[in-house]
Amino acid sequence: MAAILGKKIGMTSIYNANREAEPCTVIQAGPCFVSQVKTTENDGYEAYQLSIGERKEAKVSKPLRGHFAKAGIAPGYKVVEFGKDDMGLDLEQGSAVSVEIFSAGDAVEVQGVSKGKGFAGVVKRHNFSGGQRTHGQSDRLRAPGSVGGASDPSRTFKGTKMGGRMGGKTVKVKGLEIVKVIPESNLLVIKGSVPGVKNSYVQIVSSKK
């Protein structure tokens, strides 16, 4: 098991052994630093808090400055907690975690925040087919249709598919494969796409299956 924080750089394509172009995502994973070690005695569970990036101290609140100073590391941009089982390593506060914990061919799960699409109607958001394109139809082409009768059920059921804000949610993609590890640049090349926009932070964890 292994886990790390990374920043999505963008997408590219790599040719496989069969000379077929495969879409890949490039992630700058680390170096990360252990900002806190949580133990059963103090916190009731075992976990590692990882920090990535480096921020100016003036931009960080005083309590956070003290938190990072206690670990002997610079303030980070993003802090995420991973269970000890997910990490699969015995780490100390302040120690570094690099991409070298992964190798090519490893199966991973990547979690991030999907791209926000803004307000979307039911056709785009839920793949509704829309109204009939027939004679007399004027404005029902992309409408949701009935969402609850006046007399029965005389209400709209909770969870009814309607227009609304689309995207911008936490998404986890499973069954991805690491194609290449570039330790000197702290880069992971992962086959396929991962959630999020460019420069957004993602969590990479070894697949449990």
From Swiss-Prot:
The keyword Cytoplasm does not apply. Keywords: Ribonucleoprotein, Ribosomal protein, RNA-binding, rRNA-binding. One of its GO terms (molecular function) is structural constituent of ribosome. It holds the Pfam family Ribosomal_L3. Residues 127-164 are annotated as: Disordered. One of its GO terms (biological process) is translation. This is Large ribosomal subunit protein uL3. It comes from Chlorobium phaeobacteroides (strain BS1).
